[in-house]
């Protein structure tokens, strides 16, 4: 069963999608946090749901559009809005779905936002966290690998820019300044490390493999390299392998 719905609070309307057999009898929710320029209908989430729901009963996969992504109505992306969206969705899972066992699957920008959330709130709302190709160096990735020279010129003139890959996102200089100052590589995650696993492709062309490996070593986080996988894990067999590791981790 797949259901689309909105979580509405004053000033916010978060576009969500939930996949599961019987949403009224849930014991576990895995919150999928997509990457920069992504959306709630990402194929990776569907592949994961298909594999996970066949192995975990009374479980649902919930995915939502980050601010300024997918069908979200916010015009410009801010880290503050991302934090608020994640808080609202977590509140919905606990208070409306009445589920206490919440895990997280974050990819790329979504992985960055999950780790930022742990630091900013000094707590972990998830029983387990599995990240695929997390953008630990988010500022460098946006500025060096995503933005065009024209984007950079427009920013110097005080203009907002549309940037991204397949789908563009509206950002401004203040967003970049925030990313630069909110560098998760400078923060300590040792208190949360036992409940985190990071999977990364050795051929990731967006998020440098060695940067993520170093991040996991510094924080004693379980690290699973996938040979020859790119950033999006476009090879379905490699995606299935990554998901198999995640599913066992979430079941533990």
Question: Which residues does each PLM region occupy?
Answer:
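N-terminal cap/lid segment of alpha/beta-hydrolase-fold proteins
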Residues: 1-23
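Short beta-strand element of the alpha/beta-hydrolase
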Residues: 26-35
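The serine-hydrolase catalytic nucleophile loop
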Residues: 37-50, 210
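Gly/Ala-rich beta-loop-alpha elbow adjacent to hydrolase catalytic centers
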Residues: 106-114
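Conserved alpha/beta-hydrolase
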Residues: 49-71
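Active-site glycine-rich loops that stabilize anionic/oxyanionic intermediates
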Residues: 34-39, 202
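The alpha/beta-hydrolase serine catalytic core
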Residues: 77, 112, 124-215, 219-225, ...
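Catalytic nucleophile-loop/oxyanion-hole region of alpha/beta-hydrolase
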Residues: 67-99
């Amino acid at each position: 069963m797949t259901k689309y719905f909105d979580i509405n609070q004053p000033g916010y309307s978060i576009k969500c999608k939930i996949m599961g057999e019987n949403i009224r009898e849930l014991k576990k929710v895995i919150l999928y946090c997509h990457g920069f320029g992504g959306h709630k209908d990402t194929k990776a989430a569907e592949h994961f749901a298909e594999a996970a729901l066949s192995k975990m009963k009374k479980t649902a996969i919930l995915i939502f559009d980050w601010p300024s992504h997918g069908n979200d109505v916010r015009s410009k992306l801010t880290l503050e809005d991302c934090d608020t969206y994640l808080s609202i969705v977590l509140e919905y899972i606990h208070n409306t779905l009445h589920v206490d066992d919440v895990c997280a699957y974050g990819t790329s920008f979504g992985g960055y936002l999950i780790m930022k959330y742990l630091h900013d709130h000094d707590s972990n709302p998830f029983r387990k966290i599995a990240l695929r190709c997390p953008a630990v160096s988010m500022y460098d990735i946006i500025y060096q690998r995503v933005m065009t020279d024209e984007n950079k010129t427009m920013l110097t003139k005080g203009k907002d820019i549309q940037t991204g890959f397949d789908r563009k996102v509206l950002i401004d200089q203040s967003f970049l300044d925030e990313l630069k100052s909110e560098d998760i590589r400078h923060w300590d995650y040792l208190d949360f490390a036992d409940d985190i696993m990071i999977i990364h492709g050795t051929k990731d062309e967006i998020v440098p493999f060695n940067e993520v490996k170093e991040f996991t070593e510094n924080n004693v986080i379980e690290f699973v390299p996938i040979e020859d996988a790119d950033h999006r894990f476009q090879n379905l067999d490699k995606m299935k392998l990554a998901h198999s590791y995640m599913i066992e981790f979430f079941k533990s």
